[in-house]
Amino acid sequence: VRSRLLSIPGFDFRQDYLDCQYKELTIPARDGEFALDPEALHIWPRGGSMMIALPNPDRSFTCTLFWPPTGPGSFDEVRTGEQALAYFTAHYPDAVPLMPDLVADYDANPVGSLVTVRCGRWSANGRVALIGDAAHAITPFFGQGANSGFEDVAELDRCLGEADGDWSVALPAYEKARVDNANAIADMALANFVEMSTKSGSRVFQAQKSVQHAFERLLPEHYVSRYELVSFSTIPYAEVVRRTTVPSQARSVAAGIAHRVAAPLRSLSGRGGAS
């Protein structure tokens, strides 16, 4: 469908491949239990590359390598399972004892590409529209690929309801509501790759995250992190971006602190008046 729509003048389409590919490996359960903390996101940051591990219901972990296609530490350099074992021993030594099937997994599992798709228009003539990855494929670094597609469905359903089932009205409205949000989560996912692969190993970055978590605990009505808003709310992605700029979050923290300070002062003032 998208290929046919590309023949329409002005139907812009872009796909950008990340200079990084991926391969999945496994950390199996150990004696029927998780080998790592299942409540944590495990990241092995290595500059422009990384490995992550996410828990599964069977208490194993799926590990994903995000490596460049060529150059040092790339899939082109590390081609076989035996080469992977040597590379892991040097660069991911703590993971090697957790991965008894590393050699076999590395040889068996394919290398995949990561691409961001953007379309300037999603609908045509009030009769056809793109949805999900056809309109806005994104990289997986915010875990929102499927969810953003589900949001398309919810928005299209809402627009059809408001248009009394008139597709010629609903489809342009759906497109208008979703394009900016799709671009926003695509950008946030790409930014999160840099954060995870390059910044997460920095002590300064870890200190910043600790401060953010403290604000979330102490000022829950005023400060919410970007991750929380994206993952655990239905706030539109573009609105999340606006709310989580540094100036906006600084204002939220200031308002929260002012509220915390003012509350006991008002209480003291009230008691003073009563006496």
Residue spans of the language-model regions?
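Non-transmembrane alpha-helical segments in soluble domains
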Residues: 2, 85-89, 157, 175, ...
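Conserved mid-domain beta->alpha element of the FAD-binding
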Residues: 25, 110-201
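Amphipathic alpha-helical interaction segments
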Residues: 52, 69, 75, 95, ...
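Selective for proline/serine-rich intrinsically disordered segments
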Residues: 91, 95-98, 138, 218, ...
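C-terminal helical "tail/cap" subdomain of flavin- and related membrane-associated enzymes
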Residues: 158-275
